[in-house]
Amino acid sequence: MRNTASDNGLTLTVYAGTTGVQLAWDAEEGLREDLLGFAIKRYGGTHPEGAWLQGGIGFPAQHHPPGEFLDTHLAPIQAFRWGDYTVRPDTDYRYELVPMYAPADALRPGATASTTLRTEKLDVAPHSIAFNRAVAASQAYSRRFGEADPHENAAARAWLARGLDDFIDAFIARAGGDSALDIVIYEYELERIRQALLAAAARGASVRIVYHAASGDEQTATNAANIAADGWPQDAVRPRVTSNICHDKTIVFSRVANGERRPEAVLTGSTNWTFNGLYYQANVGHVVDDGDVARRYLALFEQLFAGATPSDMRAWLADNDPVPSGAAVDEPLQLLFSPRPDRSDLDYYVSLIGGATRSLIFATAFDLDDAVLSALAGEGGARRILRYGLQNSASRVTGYNRELARNFTATGRLRSAPDEFLQEHTPGQRGGILMHAKVILLDFDTARPMLISGSANYSVDSSENNDENTLVIRGDARVADIYLAELFRLFDHYRFRYNWSHPAAAGEEGGGTEARRAVLDDTPAWTDRYYADANDPHAIERRQLSRPLTAAPA
């Protein structure tokens, strides 16, 4: 849901997801004098009387205990975009934007603008979407749980999962005696999900599993051991023998009548069935309640269950599920599967990215195909649009680029935290993957956004060698806004941490510092980059995101 309101020289737009709201605003030039930032007050939910949104950075003269957050009417937001990630789904809220004026030690509020919204429901056919929180390396986790290992702390697990575990369980719980679950899974590990599948089988559901299997592969040994331990009959399971990765994480739900499966829905996304995947790594679960979509996933499953080799699958997909072309390019929902005999799916993604007219934001886990990375980065004479990106590890395009209106960052944590911040840890995590979703969102501030999301890492291996699946969804603002709120949550969280550790990458994006402190500017000079040059990306962001297009982009 999106709403825009203008009053007293202010324009405020809210983009509502399920568990997050993104706010963007603009202020007329005449409001800049002595402007030290903005406060935001939210009404509704658990605080009908109103509560100030908070931040972690104050003015130089303000000191606070490490990890304590500050109300924005005391330490205002020195930006024209902010996120609220304390909302609940399907709930009414009102946001009030308040300019705050000098002096810093006795801030004066200006005239306000406000707007209302209702956050999106979690379960609305055809698309139900859940992101985990997955930021163990955060001030909020450190403040709540210290260095507690979530393996041993149920409250920490619940906070990190933020309902993604329940979301997966609820999909499996649909299955009973008149239904079936057909699964393709890379990592058959997490006890919670395994028990949910066994419970479905005990209720009478027909359960079949295709699992990743590669010679000499540690994951294969783990999968096979868990399959055996769970007692699945041999005719219900198939190893997906491959020299690469069976990287899908899909469950097809079907009704069964007269022994025939009638597919109704599919659960897909980026979430591996591991402790890391559910609790430490940023991931998404996405349910599509659509019989036609589920039928295509089931057809793919049947090929794998019948023992098709990777070569067989390349040929079968080329003949039966080609990359969209012609009139199919404009369909509101597209599916792309791999392995492909060529890089046609990657080239298709490059063409979609190149067609964006106003904005893009992405989050990816591993090294991207260079043509995909170049398209996301706006290289090669591409249209100048707002570009935001988060990669698990830094790449050649990481950092702030004014010329290309590009702000790309990588994950990080505050091992050497600023003063007044707590140290951050990832207790109990295996490996260093923090960002695991594979999402590209195009023209998100228009009436025709486009989402690309699934299991594929947009690499040559994911295209030509791995078993993967990807959704392309056009023109669904609800879906886009749910993803947008979470992408900006993760982008802003990690950008601050990466820039603190890599100040050269921040460029003009670098915030104020005072020795080992991150501080606000106690003068209105912070506004210069938003107003001095109309072509500066900060100025474009201020004008553009506060005024989303209500018609499809040209």
Predicted regions and their residues:
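Interdomain helical connector at the RecA1-RecA2 junction of SF1/SF2 helicase-like NTPases
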Residues: Y297-F301
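Beta-propeller domains
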Residues: A318-G389
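Extended, charge-rich helix/loop segments that form flexible
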Residues: F305-N320
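Structural motif
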Residues: V184-E187, H212-A214, F362-D367
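Structured alpha-helical segments in the cores of large, soluble enzyme domains
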Residues: L160-F171, D342-V350
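PLD/PLD-like phosphodiesterase catalytic module centered on the HKD motif
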Residues: M1-R157, D165, D169, G177-S179, ...
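Glycine-rich phosphate-binding "P-loop"
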Residues: R133-G163, A318-R343
